[in-house]
Amino acid sequence: MSGHSFGGWTTLKTLENDDRIRAILPLAPAGGANGDDEDPLSSALTFDWCQKVPALYIVSDLDSILPLSGMHDLHQRNPEPKIVVILENADHFHFNDDVEANQDSFKQFMEAATADADEDTKRGMDAMLSLMKPSSELVPGTHAYNLINGLGLSHFDANLRDNKDAATFLESDLRSVMAARGITISLMT
């Protein structure tokens, strides 16, 4: 099972009630605690799953909507086995189709949508949007696309098909393998 953002949260939450899921691929999921802010999505995740489920998270280091600190929280709470791959110089929309257009249009849309909002809402939105770089300053969307397809397929093949080559690949030096393809990642430990 896989999902992005709120879909990533629903992926994690589904495991509490559904024993059919045998591997997950949350992409920049919601639900990670960020500092002192009370977050109902975070508190709703118990990680008391029906069974042990291998997790491969793919997240971005510059996520302006769901910051990396929340991903660290999810990593700490998620039971083993788990891998968290961080795509460097990427933002939240790197896990969508048409990354560049989504990245740039979201910022413009939210600025317009909150133009008449109350001051607290504007302040909160401005703080988030101030972290959002234009797509021209981030890695190309193809890096995320190739990372998700390559690692995601390996993760599902290793865990759903018992493919030993895929499992061996996931245990290899992923940073070097991706670097050879021009994709910079780090691994959360």
Language-model features: locations:
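Short, electropositive, low-hydrophobicity segments enriched in small/polar residues
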Residues: 7, 64, 166
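Conserved alpha/beta-hydrolase "nucleophile elbow" surrounding the catalytic nucleophile
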Residues: 3-5
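Stable alpha-helical elements in mature extracytoplasmic
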Residues: 7-10, 70, 148, 152
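Short glycine-enriched nucleophile-adjacent loop
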Residues: 8-18
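The feature captures the conserved acid-bearing segment of alpha/beta-hydrolase catalytic domains
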Residues: 22-95
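Intrinsically disordered, low-complexity boundary segments flanking structured domains
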Residues: 12-13, 70-74, 170-174
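Residue-level detector of alpha-helical segments with a strong bias toward transmembrane helices
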Residues: 17, 70, 98-102
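Alpha/beta-hydrolase-fold serine-hydrolase catalytic core, especially in secreted/extracellular enzymes
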Residues: 80, 89, 97-189
